[in-house]
Amino acid sequence: MKSISIVFPVYNEKENLEKLISSWDESLRLQNIDHEFVIVEDGSTDGTKKLILELEKKYPIINLSQNHKRGYTTAVIDGIYSSSKKFILCTDSDNQIKVKSLIENLNNFPEINEFLVGFRNPRKDPLNRLIYSKIFKILHDLLFNSKLKDPSCPFVIGLKVTYKKLDKKKLLYMKEGFWWGFIGHCIKKNIKFKEISIEHFRRETGEAGYKLKDLIGIVVRNIIGLIKIKIG
């Protein structure tokens, strides 16, 4: 029997979370998959914390809740290191990626020193995020030559032992663009990738993480972070 921890960083996702956990849990039980949900709650202010306490009573949840905001990168890393199953899937809690993408790849799980990564086909995000990603991918390809279609896709499956080979300090270089840095660091560590097409959906409720006015600062910090990973 396969066993997997699903890491969900969560911030103000009260409207999405119950539907998300319910659908994932039902599908995984039908496939007889041993699973747990590692919910890394990040200082939500919309009632998400209270909802998670209720969901804990019904579902296999590890609740990593904090009163302050640690940020996406630290949330993902905390989730990885709190997971107990053989495999770990890291993905987002905005319900833009469905459990179907995991179920369809149960026979395609990665070996050691390998990650199964998604590319959103097609990607259903706001125009400003699509433009930013296309431009930033040019820099990422110049630095790392990853050959991946979608290096920032938040759908990554790997063995726990493979995740543990990564350097937490270097992953923290990318405070706001975690998956770009994650892929770059893996390339530096000679870890391989299998890339799969996954269906991507528009966000039904809530807002995307970054505002347009913050984008210039994010771009500058991410460029510095990628360069530090490259030369580190």
Protein language model features and the residues they cover:
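Acceptor/aglycone-binding surface of glycosyltransferases and processive sugar-polymer synthases
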Residues: N67-S82, F87-C90, V99-E176, R203-K213, ...
